[in-house]
């Protein structure tokens, strides 16, 4: 908005009747300059932003970098491969992906269920304008530089693939698929991809006996038991010397229990016991919706509860 010009004194409200030519020109220049500055400020700046839109693969890289970090396991795949008796069942692996202190760099560590490190890789992401994709360079701590892969966006997921003529470590990924809940890892070593599921961390406690309903009865609590929901187990020894455990499994069913029925995914809690000879026994299980953030079971002689957010810090609700 251009400021109004006001003249104070006895002539306030109207212009003087006599202004010399020089003064008039100077006044017009001043007014013109002021108007020009005001118009420049008020004009929309859309023209300044033209040409600043990023490439789609640059935005894709940001989403990929947000999705990658997490702890993954293919326990679901390994279990159902065995149950279905597939010719070449996948072994069970864990995969930890952590963001590095360096921008756009991630550390990916694949381990066995016993914790033995299979591979540790450094994944570095770049915008690749030539291929119109996100390039991910892979450096293995043992095998060195591996085949890079290029990420592109699909329906509700990202897919990555290496060049067909690149032949490096057969265990390094040459194809990857990344979604909200899963990461699939394909390599030359295996005909089928390793189907990792993203895990969620839970904390549990177990009460013996399983006092419920607020009854005032003595019990012993075993708490601060940590595990994730992709087939992990946590163990404790009770005061009688029994080795007891809890297992969480967020089951993603690839098959149905029987024909004509759709078996729905579930979050399952198991109560198990380990004996001196190494054998185990399942005492019972309970299940709920797969997206649930807490689950419990009461066997009367034992009560167990697992949760992502403790009731000590959760927000009270009506």
Give the label of every model feature segment.
Residues 47-51:
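Boundary at the C-terminal end of the N-terminal hydrophobic targeting segment
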Residues 1-27:
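N-terminal secretory signal peptides that target proteins for export/translocation
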Residues 20, 43-44, 68-69, 94-95:
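Short, flexible coil/linker elements and helix-boundary hinge sites characteristic
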Residues 87-101:
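Short secondary-structure subsegments characteristic of cysteine-rich extracellular domains
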Residues 34-44:
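Bacterial N-terminal signal peptides
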Residues 53, 57, 61-69, 73-82, ...:
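Calycin-type beta-barrel ligand-binding domains and close structural analogs
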Residues 12, 16, 82, 86-87:
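Intrinsically disordered, low-complexity Ser/Thr/Pro-rich tracts
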